[in-house]
Amino acid sequence: MQITIITVGKLKEKYLKQGIAEYTKRLGAYCSIQEIEVPDEKAPEQLSDAEMQQVKKKEGERILAKIGPDVHVYALAIEGKQRTSEQFATELDRLATYGKSKIAFVIGGSLGLAPEVMQRANDTISFSKMTFPHQLMKMILCEQIYRAYRINRNEPYHK
């Protein structure tokens, strides 16, 4: 399975880079994983609604340019569908069983995802009703993908 994680903005924090690198290394035994960072749109701190939509639209165009037509897309969004780790594992296994060998997870920038990206998504996923920095979500996502593979192979993993 080819998994792509598409994020807006460049990851700068060393501790997050290290955590993501660790899970990416572990995932190498189970799947091919690729990370794509698209540039975030520079914008002032205070934005009107129209300016926010314009920023999300530009970031969304960059995201969509990285997604092929045969890719199953999950959009990470606070209003997305919540799952248990076991449900997520079952879902990934089912996708692989039915020939969906390319999966992309999309994490938006600080303003969220453009409506066009949400429309392209085959499904949404939320890890919590709480708000997290999008850079941290990338590491949490990597851990959950790793956990899913361990669950699907009945391999022990810390609960």
Swiss-Prot record:
<keyword id="KW-0963">Cytoplasm</keyword>
<dbReference type="GO" id="GO:0070038">
    <property type="term" value="F:rRNA (pseudouridine-N3-)-methyltransferase activity"/>
</dbReference>
<keyword id="KW-0808">Transferase</keyword>
<dbReference type="Pfam" id="PF02590">
    <property type="entry name" value="SPOUT_MTase"/>
</dbReference>
<comment type="function">
    <text>Specifically methylates the pseudouridine at position 1915 (m3Psi1915) in 23S rRNA.</text>
</comment>
<protein>
    <recommendedName>
        <fullName>Ribosomal RNA large subunit methyltransferase H</fullName>
        <ecNumber>2.1.1.177</ecNumber>
    </recommendedName>
</protein>
<dbReference type="GO" id="GO:0005737">
    <property type="term" value="C:cytoplasm"/>
</dbReference>
<comment type="similarity">
    <text>Belongs to the RNA methyltransferase RlmH family.</text>
</comment>
<feature type="binding site">
    <location>
        <position position="108"/>
    </location>
    <ligand>
        <name>S-adenosyl-L-methionine</name>
    </ligand>
</feature>
<keyword id="KW-0489">Methyltransferase</keyword>
<dbReference type="InterPro" id="IPR003742">
    <property type="entry name" value="RlmH-like"/>
</dbReference>
<dbReference type="InterPro" id="IPR029028">
    <property type="entry name" value="Alpha/beta_knot_MTases"/>
</dbReference>
<keyword id="KW-0949">S-adenosyl-L-methionine</keyword>
<keyword id="KW-0698">rRNA processing</keyword>
<dbReference type="InterPro" id="IPR029026">
    <property type="entry name" value="tRNA_m1G_MTases_N"/>
</dbReference>
<comment type="subunit">
    <text>Homodimer.</text>
</comment>
<feature type="binding site">
    <location>
        <begin position="127"/>
        <end position="132"/>
    </location>
    <ligand>
        <name>S-adenosyl-L-methionine</name>
    </ligand>
</feature>
<feature type="binding site">
    <location>
        <position position="76"/>
    </location>
    <ligand>
        <name>S-adenosyl-L-methionine</name>
    </ligand>
</feature>
